[in-house]
Amino acid sequence: MKLVFTGGGTGGHIYPALALAESFRKKGDEILYIGSNDGLERRIVPEEGFDFQGIEVAPFPRNLSVHLFSSLLKTGRGFIQARKLLRKFKPDVVIGTGGFVSGPVVLAAALQKIPTVIHEQNAYPGLANRLLAPFVTRIALNFKEADRHFKEKAREKIEITGNPIRERILTTSREEGLLNLGLRKGKKNILVFGGSQGAKNINEAMIACYRYFKNNSKLQIIHLTGMRNYQEVLQDLKEKGLDPSKYTQYKIMPYLDNMEWAYAVADLVIYRAGATGLAEITAKGIPAILIPYPYATGNHQEHNARSLEKAGAAIVIKDSELKGHKLVKLIEELINDGKRLKKMAQSSKRMGKPWARNTLINLIEDTAKGS
């Protein structure tokens, strides 16, 4: 079988596609990934060993502005490029996982009568998937409540599948993670990240944590700052006399391609609340402190976070209320309360859907066969 995957802009759209693509590659199927020339996927996808073709696309402005015409023009060129790539590759099915690049690719496939599947990770669907819904063959959702944002006719195509997780996230051992990250055994490990783009407020709050925990020999921190804020975080720490090179218990990096190592060792995660990251966290059963991104479409990140909080798997702090001293206090409370941390981990594990990848694979195969 020949499959085209498309989706990008952030890791939240890219990694679900890669989780599925990995499984189909193991079956001997032929994969092509179509992404943006300017997106994160342009680097990540080839590094994972998949054929990648870039097209021209631009996000639509949320409000009417002078940028709308240029976005339409660029996306129109991307549509023509996608159509040519599809005619040449002749896929049996096209799968879109969101982000503005998926729009022209999936639409071009649908208009060529190629079976199409879109996957929506969030409780509030992204613009691309809402616009594509009338044209596609099937719609896969992570959250059941997302279906109310689609028109009635589109709802007939919906299946609740969960969010696909890369196999190595599920199988990597703690020992392997410790070895690859250069961390010591027998300590509590905290993973801090704000998604593939980073999170400035979380980074700033962590400065207070580094100062407070610098002499705590029982704690290790893996902090992924995001590319944009990495140098700023290092400089800030050095100015406060906390040169990271002198503190081996702190692993501060702009980004980590091998997230399976970090998840494998984490006893607590501090994160935004993107759906893909939450799917990975719950599949591993890791307790979390969540700081939802306040400007996400439809405030979907807070909705995502509150669902974990309600289940007892996470504690939620609003971005506007995030302060360094507050984060320090919460970390200390959790790390020193083994029973509470264990209970949160159990709740997190119950929320996980490690089987989601297989459900989606079956849906995609059925769609390609026309059943």
From Swiss-Prot:
As recorded in UniProt, its EC number(s) are 2.4.1.227
Taken from the record, one Pfam family name reads Glyco_tran_28_C
Any keyword Cell inner membrane?
A: yes
What membrane topology does the UniProt entry give?
A: Peripheral membrane protein
Which GO terms are recorded in the biological process aspect for this UniProt protein? carbohydrate metabolic process; cell division; cell wall organization; lipid glycosylation; peptidoglycan biosynthetic process; regulation of cell shape
InterPro entries xref list: GlcNAc_MurG (IPR006009), Glyco_trans_28_C (IPR007235), GlycoTrans_28_N (IPR004276)
Q: Write out the pathway annotation from the protein's UniProt entry.
A: Cell wall biogenesis; peptidoglycan biosynthesis
Q: Which CDD domains match?
A: GT28_MurG (cd03785)
Q: Name one GO cellular component term.
A: plasma membrane
Which reactions appear under catalytic activity for this entry?
Answer: di-trans,octa-cis-undecaprenyl diphospho-N-acetyl-alpha-D-muramoyl-L-alanyl-D-glutamyl-meso-2,6-diaminopimeloyl-D-alanyl-D-alanine + UDP-N-acetyl-alpha-D-glucosamine = di-trans,octa-cis-undecaprenyl diphospho-[N-acetyl-alpha-D-glucosaminyl-(1->4)]-N-acetyl-alpha-D-muramoyl-L-alanyl-D-glutamyl-meso-2,6-diaminopimeloyl-D-alanyl-D-alanine + UDP + H(+)
- Protein's cellular compartments: Cell inner membrane
Q: Which domain of life is it from?
A: Bacteria
Which is an annotated GO molecular function term of this record? UDP-N-acetyl-D-glucosamine:N-acetylmuramoyl-L-alanyl-D-glutamyl-meso-2,6-diaminopimelyl-D-alanyl-D-alanine-diphosphoundecaprenol 4-beta-N-acetylglucosaminlytransferase activity
Q: Which SUPFAM superfamilies match?
A: UDP-Glycosyltransferase/glycogen phosphorylase
What are the UniProt keywords, alphabetically? Cell cycle, Cell division, Cell inner membrane, Cell membrane, Cell shape, Cell wall biogenesis/degradation, Glycosyltransferase, Membrane, Peptidoglycan synthesis, Transferase
Record: residues binding UDP-N-acetyl-alpha-D-glucosamine: 10-12, 122, 166, 196, 301
Could you say which protein family the record assigns here?
Belongs to the glycosyltransferase 28 family. MurG subfamily.
* Function, as annotated: Cell wall formation. Catalyzes the transfer of a GlcNAc subunit on undecaprenyl-pyrophosphoryl-MurNAc-pentapeptide (lipid intermediate I) to form undecaprenyl-pyrophosphoryl-MurNAc-(pentapeptide)GlcNAc (lipid intermediate II).
Q: State the protein's name.
A: UDP-N-acetylglucosamine--N-acetylmuramyl-(pentapeptide) pyrophosphoryl-undecaprenol N-acetylglucosamine transferase
